[in-house]
Structures are given as structure tokens and as C-alpha cells.
């Protein structure tokens, strides 16, 4: 079958032919319809330090997708041929303390689809049936293909009560923008998003944020004053991994504020712990999606009217995959989808 693979330990990604994946007793086989390019895939393309330490070569990459079930293992229940599915990209062990307690998103033995095992940039993907999620009929393929990153956004945004609260989102990448849209949809008062990329700040405005602030030109405290915010943000969602953004978040949080952190800093990050202590801040680390509560929330949010379509800015046929990676690497895109069918 055709697949996009990391064939060499250098910059790039290549179309190749690989064997059809084997189907286990508890697995399903999915014929991929659409797959989206994740920031992780760009890291792998660039062959940065993280990728060099993490990705075995060769590796079929990709983990954001939607497709149709074409085969089921003999022990599988609840799925049948023809079902339209996406899937959780973190395959968990089922045996550690967190897995046995139902907190599978905290499994210490997680294996990543398209990172540690064959991924979704291929004609067919095999995953454990446990990891598959049926897509409701009224959710289109393009939105289903971005459920994985949407899940990061939902998990982060819904970590704390948002109703009537003022929220700061640092980082206007696609996940940050989707998180901001979730905050607005569920009843936050002011949702302010910060970045230095004007293209993505414009995209955030299309998604309905209260203010999109280019912090290289605008003062966040002045924006807060213009909005009538005299005490600071109640909730912070750190999506950038940029130390200056996190420092600004700490500066502008209200006493008793709550921060959810999804962005990954490039290395050790020093912060002013006095702010955390004397403001009584709560900081929560976020990884992946809660299995599978986040997935049900994702579907329900879209079915209740949350419109994510503006975040999908580019779609390409799979043979034009290089164009997709080029636009992702440029920073002038939202989500980029590759069409396999």
C-alpha cells in the first residue's frame, strides 16, 4: 500500500510502498479517507532533536485521520465493516496503575500511532478496537479528521469551569484557536488569545475570540484595561510552550486563578514561583485526551453548534503532500488535510 514514511534520518518525508498492516484478534483495519498534518509530523519532517531521539527509521507517520472500517479481528465487539471512525492515537498498556484505575490518558507505557508504531499517513491503518471512536453521521469527514488535535483543545479548555470567566490563551496555533473557540462556546466572558503570528491571530478572530493580541506590538495589560478587566484572568490556557508567554500569563492571572498547560517548552523553564505561591495559582499539566470522555465531549460540542470549519484552511490530494508540509512549515495555515480518497 502507499504510505508517507520517514525513510531517512534527515529532513523530509517520502511516499513509498509498505506491506499491509497485520490484523490482530482485537484490532480493526481502517481504510483512510482523510488525514491531517500535526505539528508533531512537522517536527518529524524537520528531523529536530526530539525526532532524532524518538522516531525509529523507517516509520510510517501520521496520527490524525478519519476512515472506514474494512476488517475486524475475531474478538472485536461493537464495530462492524462500514463504520466511519477516527481513533485515539495513544495506545495504552492496560496493566499499569492508571490504566487499571480508568485513567488511561496517564498510562506510563503509552505507544504513539505514527511515532512508535505505524501511523495513519497510509491507505490502511490497524489499531486496537479499544482505540477507535465512531463518528456520528452529522459530523463531516474533514472535522472528524482533526478530532485528535481538537481533543487536545477540549481536554485543556474543559479542565476548569469557564462559565462567566475571563480566559487567556497563549499560543494561536490550531489547538490554541480551537481551545479559545471552545471557551466561547461554553460560556466564558472574555477570551483573549496572544501570539506573534498575524495570520493565525486573524484566524482566531474568525473563530470568535474577544481579542487576538500580537504581543510584539500590543500591551496585554492595556487590552485588559480596555475590556474592563481590573483583576486579571481567571483561567489561563498555555498552548505555546514559549517561556515569555508563560511569564506574561503568570503576571496577568487573578489571585486564585487556574492554569492548564499543554504547550511543551523547549527545555528547562525558570518561572517566578512567588507569583504562583502568593497568588494561590493552580497549575495543571495536560497530555493527550481523556479516554474517552474527551471524545464524547468533542462530538457533542460540534453537534451543539461549535463551528470549527474556519480552522481547516488547506486540503490537498495525497500525491501533493509536499505542498501540505510546505504550507504547514510556513506558519501561514490552520489545519492542513491530505485526502486519500
Swiss-Prot record:
Keywords: Cytoplasm, Metal-binding, NAD, Oxidoreductase, Zinc. Pfam families: ADH_N (PF08240), ADH_zinc_N (PF00107). SUPFAM superfamilies: GroES-like (SSF50129), NAD(P)-binding Rossmann-fold domains (SSF51735). Binds 2 Zn(2+) ions per subunit. Zn(2+) 1 binds at residues 38, 63-64. The record marks 148 as: Important for catalytic activity for the proton relay mechanism but does not participate directly in the coordination of zinc atom. Its EC number is 1.1.1.103. NAD(+) binds at residues 175, 195, 200, 262-264, 286-287. It catalyses: L-threonine + NAD(+) = (2S)-2-amino-3-oxobutanoate + NADH + H(+). The active site is at residues 40, 43. It is found in: Cytoplasm. InterPro entries: ADH-like_C, ADH-like_N, ADH_Zn_CS, GroES-like_sf, L-Threonine_3-DHase, NAD(P)-bd_dom_sf, PKS_ER, Zn_alcohol_dh. Pathway: Amino-acid degradation; L-threonine degradation via oxydo-reductase pathway; glycine from L-threonine: step 1/2. GO terms for molecular function: L-threonine 3-dehydrogenase activity; zinc ion binding. GO terms for cellular component: cytoplasm. Catalyzes the NAD(+)-dependent oxidation of L-threonine to 2-amino-3-ketobutyrate. Homotetramer. This is L-threonine 3-dehydrogenase.
Amino acid at each position: 500500500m502507499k504510505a508517507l514514511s520517514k525513510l531517512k534520518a534527515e529532513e523530509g518525508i517520502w511516499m513509498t510502498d509498505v506491506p499491509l498492516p497485520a490484523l490482530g484478534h482485537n484490532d480493526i483495519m481502517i481504510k483512510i479517507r482523510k488525514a491531517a498534518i500535526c505539528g508533531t509530523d512537522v517536527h518529524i519532517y524537520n528531523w529536530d532533536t526530539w525526532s532524532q531521539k524518538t522516531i525509529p527509521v523507517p516509520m510510517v507517520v501520521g496520527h490524525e485521520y478519519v476512515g472506514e472500517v474494512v476488517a475486524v479481528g475475531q474478538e472485536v465487539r461493537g464495530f462492524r465493516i462500514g463504520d466511519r471512525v477516527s481513533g485515539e492515537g495513544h495506545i495504552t498498556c492496560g496493566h499499569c496503575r492508571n490504566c487499571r484505575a480508568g485513567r488511561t490518558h496517564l498510562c506510563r507505557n503509552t505507544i504513539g500511532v505514527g511515532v512508535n508504531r505505524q501511523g495513519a499517513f497510509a491507505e490502511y491503518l490497524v489499531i486496537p478496537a479499544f482505540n477507535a471512536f465512531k463518528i456520528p453521521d452529522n459530523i463531516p469527514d474533514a472535522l472528524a479528521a482533526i478530532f485528535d488535535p481538537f481533543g487536545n483543545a477540549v481536554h485543556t479548555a474543559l479542565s476548569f469551569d469557564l462559565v462567566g470567566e475571563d480566559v487567556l490563551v497563549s499560543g494561536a496555533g490550531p489547538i490554541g484557536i480551537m481551545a479559545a473557540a471552545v471557551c466561547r462556546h461554553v460560556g466564558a466572558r472574555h477570551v483573549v488569545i496572544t501570539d506573534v503570528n498575524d495570520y493565525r491571530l486573524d484566524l482566531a478572530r474568525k473563530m470568535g475570540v474577544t481579542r487576538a493580541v500580537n504581543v510584539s506590538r500590543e500591551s496585554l495589560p492595556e487590552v485588559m484595561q480596555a475590556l474592563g478587566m481590573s483583576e486579571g484572568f481567571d483561567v489561563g490556557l498555555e498552548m505555546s510552550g514559549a517561556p515569555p508567554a508563560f511569564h506574561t500569563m503568570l503576571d496577568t492571572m487573578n489571585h486564585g486563578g487556574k492554569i492548564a498547560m499543554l504547550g511543551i517548552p523547549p527545555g528547562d523553564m525558570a518561572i517566578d514561583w512567588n507569583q504562583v505561591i502568593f497568588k494561590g495559582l493552580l497549575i495543571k499539566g495536560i497530555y493527550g485526551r481523556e479516554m474517552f470522555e474527551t471524545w464524547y465531549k468533542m462530538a457533542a460540542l460540534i453537534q451543539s453548534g461549535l463551528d470549527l470549519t474556519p480552522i481547516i484552511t488547506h486540503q490537498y490530494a495525497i500525491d501533493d503532500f509536499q505542498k501540505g508540509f510546505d504550507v504547514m512549515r510556513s506558519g501561514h495555515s490552520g489545519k492542513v488535510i491530505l485526502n486519500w480518497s
